Design a protein with these regions (language model features):
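Positively charged n-region of N-terminal signal peptides that target proteins for export
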Residues: 1-6
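Extracytoplasmic substrate-binding proteins
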Residues: 24-25, 29-30, 34, 113-197, ...
Length: 343
């Protein structure tokens, strides 16, 4: 059986050339831009490239709302220089405030985030990959990475492709064994006590479950349009599905396990009875969305379902190595505990 310790070294070796690439690039003059990113998930990709990160002056507030700011501030002590104030409370763009940032490049993710950004009079770049690739986390992060680097005149680093490739190779023997068990999983996007939303087919959540060898209980639903892929369901529907395991993204696994959400009856599910309800980690962003740490998520899911395959200690070691190789960040124990703790 492939050990995660070996995977850890593979990941480190796969990424070890990146610092040399960066230093070589710094020998050549690089034009400094003032860039704005209206979305949240693409910002994580820029955090892995110091030459790109230093050029960011504004980012959508979701980038910080769904992050563990203790981790983000420790890794990037200057993060406070990046403003979110150009986004109004209704999530529309405040053009007057945006222009005070004097941007020369604006990146947005999908047409819903455009908000007539051409009014700013500077180039705008859509980070939506389009087609079926937009639901593939690896293809999406690869696209973001190369688009940022090309637009900013930076050398290609290929970090996220290598990170995902490492995960795919590492997880294969585990996923094959889990697949034989026909584990039925629910990817619970939202569970705030008011709305229950799940990942249907052709979503990032569906992809993560499949990578980990699990079957998405909502994967057979008929959906249409991007918004429809994240499906509002009833508690009765979830009880009928009776999932073996539940991964909670924007919500609290503890709230479900302790029945703290009014009107929800999780004790009727197999996952609740076996205490197999888990929150996705939160670091630079929530891993369960599409964060800079998400290449680790399928292995995290395996570690919760089958700790004999991937132990907590191995998951901690892999996470620590990932932060160091991707961000040159030595995460302290107390913050590593925060990232991997159950909410």
């Amino acid at each position: 059986m492939l050990k995660v310790l070996h995977v850890l070294y593979t990941l480190m070796l796969a990424l070890c050339l990146f610092p040399m690439v960066v230093h070589a690039a710094m020998d050549e003059p690089i034009r400094h831009h003032r860039i704005i990113i209206t979305g949240n998930c693409p910002f994580g990709v820029i955090l892995a490239n110091p030459l790109a990160y230093r050029q960011v002056v504004g980012v959508g507030p979701w980038a910080f709302l769904h992050a563990d700011m203790n981790v983000l501030k420790d890794m990037k002590p200057d993060i406070g220089r990046i403003t979110t104030h150009f986004i109004n409370d209704d999530y529309s763009v405040n053009l007057e405030t945006l222009l005070t940032l004097h941007p020369d490049l604006i990146f947005y993710y999908g047409q819903s985030q455009n908000d007539h950004l051409e009014r700013a009079g500077v180039p705008v770049i859509n980070l939506d990959t389009g087609g079926s690739a937009k639901y593939d986390p690896e293809a999406t992060q690869n696209y973001w990475e190369t688009t940022f680097e090309d637009a900013l005149g930076l050398p290609r680093t290929d970090k996220f492709h290598r990170a995902w490739e490492t995960t795919r190779k590492a997880i294969q023997p585990y996923a094959d064994r889990i697949r034989q068990q026909h584990v039925r999983a629910l990817y619970l996007e939202q569970s705030d006590g008011k709305t229950l939303r799940v990942s249907g087919p052709h979503t990032f959540g569906d992809t993560y479950l499949n990578m980990a060898g699990m079957e998405n209980v909502a994967g057979h639903l008929q959906v249409s349009g991007d918004a429809g892929r994240y499906i509002t369901v009833s508690m009765e529907q979830i009880m009928a599905w009776n999932p073996d395991v539940i991964f909670v993204v924007f919500g609290s696994a503890r709230a479900l396990l302790n029945n703290r959400n009014p009107g929800q009856m999780w004790q009727g599910t197999r996952a609740w009875k076996n205490k197999r309800i888990y929150s996705t980690p939160v670091g630079l962003h929530n891993w369960g969305g599409l964060s800079a740490e998400t290449p680790l998520l399928p292995l995290f899911m395996v570690s919760k379902l089958e700790p004999d395959f991937v132990s907590d200690a191995e998951m901690r070691g892999l996470t620590r190595a990932y932060y160091k190789t991707m961000f040159d960040y030595a995460i302290p124990d107390r913050l590593l505990n925060e990232v991997l703790s159950q909410r």
